[in-house]
């Protein structure tokens, strides 16, 4: 029965999974945690291990089977004491002491607030919170569900929020899995996401594609959404669906978007501010695809994360892409990184980030590159110490442009997830001026 359930879950969409587990009656302790290095003085544990004390701070917890999870986090680029975060379905977290204590509130909008939170800040301390739409409040029972991607903005550190804006798009179709990028020192907000003709449809005529839009006035208005992926996928929300689009903008003004499709990682480039796009480039393979099974995780996501080095260091301009896959077997999920030193024209062979012996699972990675140092930080779940589903959280960091990584366990104790609980699709990490704040989900019980 256990094996059957694992196979069954592989074919469930994310939203089907959320509906099913939300109807179960089980006792689960859910928590969102953030890693703090106490007494950092603008240095983190990874820069001076002996001078700091690791502490895991619980931001939020719940007995609800669908959340809080899918945390997103951002350190203010101008005041590292200010840290903001979000989680499904509508939670907003605010800290003004570097993440030691948190205030919790909920977003509201007439467009509906329904998960997939992405939270980012600009250089004026404005906060942007992107999420899925649920305008009638009836979610899966209404055709207007997922009819756009909404970005709400706060200009007073989360005390108040506008109702949200959104790019012009086809509201008959479904819109999901967005991400934001805010170039330093600008009013620009970049957003990419997946458009489904009909989410979860098995009809081969229904297709998926990657869309992009940009705002040049702090998310007040948006350019019309444009399709940038040359190949379209299915709508099943699996490896044959075009998903996991992340945008970045590099120092020369070029915009890049990466995503996964059909066991490959794709990259597209625009040199005119997102108006026109080039031919999609395959920059890495992803054997086993971006969605795969890990024991006790009903759905595991290995979608790629792209970033670049905007520091003045020796690796300035280098682009990085990070992902997870099962190229070494279904019992050996690993974390990978590839890099480009020629503006995305060519990419290195994959570099294995986790430094354990083969045969254990590492999964759910997320990456950030500190713009002040160029150091790379990757957070992920790790089972190297166990023969069962017990799970730790690790931070890997590189000071040499991704050539080598040091791995450090940052969770205080392991947890064991439950297959009947929606665990989300991602965690997050933010790195600014040597301050590192990874955030992750913990689930115990059942």
Model-predicted segments: where are they?
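Ala/Thr-enriched low-complexity intrinsically disordered regions
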Residues: 13, 29-31
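C-terminal motif of bacterial Sec signal peptides marking the signal peptidase cleavage site
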Residues: 36-39
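Detector for intrinsically disordered, low-structure N-terminal pre-sequences
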Residues: 2, 20-21, 33, 45
């Amino acid at each position: 029965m256990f094996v059957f359930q694992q196979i069954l879950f592989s074919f469930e969409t994310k939203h089907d999974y959320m509906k099913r587990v939300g109807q179960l009656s089980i006792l689960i302790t859910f928590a969102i945690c953030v890693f703090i290095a106490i007494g950092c003085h603008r240095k983190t544990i990874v820069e001076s291990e002996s001078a700091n004390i690791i502490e895991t701070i619980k931001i939020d917890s719940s007995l609800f089977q669908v959340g809080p999870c899918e945390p997103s986090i951002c350190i203010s680029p101008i005041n590292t004491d200010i840290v903001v975060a979000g989680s499904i379905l509508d939670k907003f977290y605010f800290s003004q002491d570097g993440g030691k204590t948190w205030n919790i509130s909920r977003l509201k909008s007439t467009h509906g607030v329904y998960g997939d939170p992405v939270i980012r800040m600009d250089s004026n301390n404005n906060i942007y919170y992107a999420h899925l739409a649920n305008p009638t409040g009836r979610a899966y029972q209404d055709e207007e569900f997922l009819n756009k991607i909404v970005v709400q903005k706060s200009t007073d550190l989360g005390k108040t929020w506008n109702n949200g804006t959104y790019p012009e798009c086809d509201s008959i179709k479904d819109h999901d899995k967005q991400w934001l990028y805010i170039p330093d020192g600008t009013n620009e907000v970049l957003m990419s996401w997946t458009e489904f003709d009909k989410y979860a449809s098995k009809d081969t005529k229904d297709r998926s594609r990657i869309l992009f839009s940009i705002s040049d006035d702090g998310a007040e208005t948006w350019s019309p959404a444009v399709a940038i992926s040359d190949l379209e996928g299915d709508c099943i929300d699996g490896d044959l669906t075009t998903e996991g689009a992340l945008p970045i903008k590099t120092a020369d003004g070029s915009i890049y978007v990466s995503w996964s499709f059909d066991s490959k990682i794709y990259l597209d480039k625009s040199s005119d501010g997102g108006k026109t796009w080039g031919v999609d480039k395959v920059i890495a393979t992803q054997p086993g695809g971006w969605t795969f099974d890990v024991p006790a995780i009903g759905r595991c996501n290995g979608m790629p994360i792209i970033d670049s080095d905007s520091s003045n260091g020796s690796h300035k301009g280098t682009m990085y892409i990070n992902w997870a896959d099962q190229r070494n077997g279904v019992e050996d999920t690993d974390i990978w990184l590839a890099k480009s030193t020629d503006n995305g024209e060519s990419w290195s062979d994959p570099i294995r980030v986790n430094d354990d012996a083969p045969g254990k699972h590492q999964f759910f990675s997320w990456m950030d590159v500190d713009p002040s140092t160029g150091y790379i930080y990757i957070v992920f779940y790790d089972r190297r110490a166990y023969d069962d589903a017990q799970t730790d959280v690790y931070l890997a960091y590189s000071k040499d442009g991704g050539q080598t990584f040091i791995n450090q366990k940052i969770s205080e104790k392991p947890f064991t997830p439950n297959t009947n609980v929606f665990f989300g699709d991602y965690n997050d990490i933010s790195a600014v001026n040597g301050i590192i704040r990874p955030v992750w989900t913990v689930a115990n019980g059942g």
